[in-house]
Amino acid sequence: MSFVPKQQPYRGRINAVTLGTGDKAIVIGGQNVLPFYTFDAEMPNAPKIGVEISDMASEWTAPALKEFYAGCATMADYAKKAETMEGADFLCLHFESADPNGANRSVEDCVADAKAVAEAVSMPIVIMGCKNIEKDGELFSKIAEALQGKNILVLSARSEDYKTVGASVALAYGQKVGAETADDINLAKQLNIMLKGLTVKPESIVMNVGTAAVGYGFEYVASTLDRIRLAALDQSDADLQMPIMSPVSPDAWSVKEATASEEDEPAWGNQEERGIAMEVSTAAANLTGGADAVIMRHPAAVATIRKFISELV
């Protein structure tokens, strides 16, 4: 007698959220199984990969990364080049220089860059800010207004500014909004409830539940992802059924394994290869934990994770 495995799909299902417009639009979420459990049920939408484009990308030092973007001068130039990257599904514009404690770039300049990128590319666009609550609130609102009709995702609304960001981004301008918390299922659920309380539709919310480079407290991330996914699928908790997007690259490329020079750590080997390894490991860990999309940076890392996803779905 042959063995016939019993499929075990869950009663709950992750919301399907569409980003972008036209032929390049993507859908994240939509599954009713744990990550890559395709033996239990089909995953209708494979996890997606976004490419980070920072307005401080000229300071990136990895040789192959600099070579890939050689000749790029503006954010729109970087975006057009990133759109050709093998494995890329969407673009993430990261406005690091807007930080008032750093370069303090003006909101108007950032909006101009976002508009130039939107005119130059056809892939879906995700927006990341500078982590300053007041500056991000203004920046997100202005970009959401300028890119009306593009169906962008803004990362992210937080407990401190969810009313401002949720109301302007999702309600006033019809964009998708991220809900950002720090490795805590209860905080993630509470923020989703508060956004829905503003009448933001569940299918307009994407969670950013926190991440970290592997080896740097990632066990907290892993347990949070596991608990959120099990609550959403097994318990049908509608307040946790939003898809998850994990910004991997800022963490992976900021740890010592990626930043220590070969002169300082000769036994560790090639510095760029270390950074790629950290990014690949962190992205894979997030995806197997439950992330529906990851944001990455290096072409070699993106290509590796694309192959990883293709072989598992």
Language-model features, listed with the residues they occupy:
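N-terminal amphipathic alpha-helix/helix-capping segment at the start of soluble metabolic enzymes
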Residues: 1-69
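Hydrophobic faces of well-ordered beta-strands that scaffold small-molecule active sites
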Residues: 47-53, 89-93, 123-129, 150-157, ...
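Active-site mouth loops of central-metabolism enzymes
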Residues: 48-78, 102-105, 129-133, 155-157, ...
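Glycine-rich, proline-tolerant flexible connector loops at the mouths of alpha/beta enzymes
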Residues: 60-64, 87-116, 121, 127-134, ...
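Short, acidic/polar
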Residues: 71-83, 139, 277-285
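Acidic (Asp/Glu)-rich catalytic clusters
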Residues: 83-86, 114-120, 141-148, 165-173, ...
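Short, electropositive alpha-helical surface patch
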Residues: 105-119, 141-153, 307-313
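Catalytic alpha/beta core domains of metabolic enzymes, predominantly
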Residues: 160-308
